[in-house]
């Protein structure tokens, strides 16, 4: 599949989701690639109480809300493993 993005974020944990939200909100074409599960390790956490603006939630709920917010701004998501990166002129190619 060949598609052009302004940014490809490798890793769909909280940091990757935050980056996707901000970049997509700024109207960048964003793809998040995660090899296992969007949300990462925090999805198995039953109690999240230290996330800014959130009094208490669980990891699954937090990251599903983050994904929805990123998607609402236009970010795309793909479940697959990145096997390589290469530089070809002005372009970066993700395999």
Protein language model features and the residues they cover:
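Beta1/beta-strand and adjacent pyrophosphate-binding region of the FAD-binding site
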Residues: 2-15
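Residue-level preference for short coil/turn positions at secondary-structure junctions
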Residues: 3-5, 26, 78, 90
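Glycine-rich FAD pyrophosphate-binding loop
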Residues: 8-10, 25-44
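A secondary-structure boundary/capping signal
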Residues: 13, 34, 78-81
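Short Gly/charged-rich anion-binding patches and loops
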Residues: 18, 37, 65
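Gly/Ala-rich phosphate-binding loop of Rossmann-like dinucleotide-binding domains
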Residues: 20, 24
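N-terminal Rossmann-like dinucleotide/flavin-binding domain of flavoprotein oxidoreductases
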Residues: 43-95
């Amino acid at each position: 599949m060949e598609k052009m993005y302004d940014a490809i974020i490798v890793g769909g944990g909280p940091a990757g989701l935050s980056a996707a939200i901000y970049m997509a909100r700024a109207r960048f074409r964003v793809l998040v690639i995660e090899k296992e599960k969007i949300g990462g390790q925090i999805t198995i956490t039953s109690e999240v109480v230290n996330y800014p603006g959130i009094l208490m939630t669980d990891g699954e709920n937090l990251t599903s809300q983050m994904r929805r917010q990123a998607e609402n701004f236009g970010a795309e998501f793909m479940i697959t493993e990145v096997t390589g990166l290469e530089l070809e002129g002005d372009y970066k190619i993700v395999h």
